[in-house]
């Protein structure tokens, strides 16, 4: 009878074929595990063990002042359903907790989404309340979560991630996740972090110095789109540019 391998012009014994199959299996298994490991590394780029996670933006006056003004601008005490994309360890929710009356805070519903499992686990422990829901999920597949519309969407330094289609995602958020007369707060980083210190000026690829044309291009796109949808738009801040939009419909 024909043995394994004869169809390729040579004869291969059963034992040799089994060895080769075993080698191929090991290589495939190793490649698959390596792929899984790299995916976890990407997901945990801003996770609990990262340098970014140890940064406390709430202790930076340049961030805190502009963010609190944005919350005042949207009348945060009147909001009931708040969605935060790229929530990380939920620093933005902590400021809201400090700003509003305790009884009002308990009536608000908070939803946070982040790609980092360790960050989401931390946020859940930080806010173990019934009116908080946190999801470890890819923002590109937000529709899989079946979220109800929110009257405030917050996203700080997330939408410009290289893994996201900025313009399409932004328009999808306005059309499908924001209530008709809701508000939105977007934070665009115009800084970089060096040894835990906030340094003014965003670092762009292929430049050895701060170059901000891409930053302002994205900000202008959002501003123009929201104005067409009947929103009043303000731009504030320095190290973080805060785009705040409130409905005038």
Please name every model-derived segment.
Residues 181-190:
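Conserved beta-strand signature within the Rossmann-like core of class I S-adenosyl-L-methionine
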């Amino acid at each position: 009878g024909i043995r394994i391998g004869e169809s390729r012009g040579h004869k291969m014994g059963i034992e040799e074929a089994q060895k080769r199959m075993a080698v191929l299996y090991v290589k495939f298994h190793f490649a698959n595990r390596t792929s899984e490991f790299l995916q976890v590394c990407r997901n945990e780029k801003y996770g609990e063990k990262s340098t970014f996670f140890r940064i406390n933006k709430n202790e930076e006056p340049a961030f805190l002042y502009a963010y609190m003004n944005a919350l005042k601008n949207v009348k945060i005490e009147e909001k009931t359903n708040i969605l935060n994309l790229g929530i990380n360890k939920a620093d933005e929710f902590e400021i809201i907790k400090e700003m509003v009356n305790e009884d009002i805070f308990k009536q608000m519903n908070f939803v946070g989404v982040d790609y980092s499992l360790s960050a989401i686990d931390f946020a859940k422990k930080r806010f173990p309340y019934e009116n908080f829901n946190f999801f470890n999920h890819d923002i590109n597949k937000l529709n899989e979560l079946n979220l109800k519309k929110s009257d405030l969407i917050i996203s700080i330094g997330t939408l410009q991630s290289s893994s996201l289609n900025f313009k399409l995602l932004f328009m999808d958020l306005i059309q499908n996740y924001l209530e008709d007369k809701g508000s939105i707060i977007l934070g665009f980083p115009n800084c970089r972090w060096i040894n835990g210190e906030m340094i003014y000026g965003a670092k762009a690829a292929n430049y050895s110095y701060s170059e901000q044309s891409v930053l302002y291009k994205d900000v202008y796109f959002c501003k123009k789109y929201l104005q067409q949808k009947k929103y009043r738009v303000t731009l504030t801040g320095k190290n973080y540019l805060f785009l705040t939009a409130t409905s005038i419909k």
